[in-house]
Amino acid sequence: MADRRTERRWLEQLTALPTAPGVEHRVLAWVEAWAARRATDLRIRSDRHGNLLLTQKGRRRRAPVVAVAHTDHPGFVVTGVDRREVEVEFRGGVRAEYFDGARVELFDSDDAGHRGRLVAYDPESERGRVQLDRTAPLVPGDIGRWFFGGKRGGVGERFALAPACDDLAGVAAALAALDRARGEPELSHFSVLLTRAEEVGFVGAIGAAKDRTVPEDSRILSIECSRAFPESPLGGGPIVRVGDASSVFDHELTNLVSEAARVRELTHQRKLMAGGSCEATAFVAYGYRATGLCLPLGNYHNMGNLDEVEQGKGMATPLPEVISISDFHGLVDLLLAATEAVDGTWDLTQRLESRFESRKHILG
């Protein structure tokens, strides 16, 4: 079982990998290599959409608990190359202001980075043109991201700064929890599903839900990184997410997770997080019991100074994303606590009956 230091190393390695919707191969390869080193305990398979499912070997005595995280992040995909002129499309949600003359880094098949400047971008078609600093062996299908200069960051004692915390920090947390669960009989039903193309409408999750990539009786813990706000700050603990902009999640499952965090005195927050929709919505829509867990995220989708930009006051500067290290470790702990807790019952009626009996005299 890995220690906290090793888990932070996985976090640093994963969140530094270039990825984009539909071209997540670097992340998937990292995970496959990680799983291969644990082949005595784990199985790994890919569904027809390219999502990866990691399960524990041995007999399962309870319905699965599946932590779901996505392997993509908003990014550029090369569509054409003419010497130093590179045509790109952008996949994911970023405000138009951040594209104006931005520096970017495109990666070839050997993982070498090639820098350039975005000289044209149409937010309607989400297509643009990059002028490279020098010619490079790029081909259609290669991917890119913002170039942060000396601000790429790393994992420190308090914070992690990285190109893609969303949702590769979630991937790291899910794998860390799975690594801890190995060999623990009471956690043998914990597994991990890593999805693709979340940033363009959680397409991979929809495919997994439609095809029943995980059994119908699975309990889904959908992991996200969600924009931090004053009421959901970095360092306040991982968030038990009761719903999103599209749906409210399974109330009993959500309450069981919250109660597990409370009983174990795990620092956490409980919020709706209605700023967007997440993969839990897809699983709920297709009949699964699902709830959400998320990490508060600074510089959401690499949009630095976002609050000021939204108010028309700040400079739209692409920056590395930021999460709290204590939130990250707390999420790993919460995943395992939730796995043990979800087979319980949440009987609110009994509590209300007791309250009624003790206070009904007030009604006269």
List each model region and its residues.
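N-terminal hydrophobic/helix-forming segments and targeting peptides
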Residues: 1-364
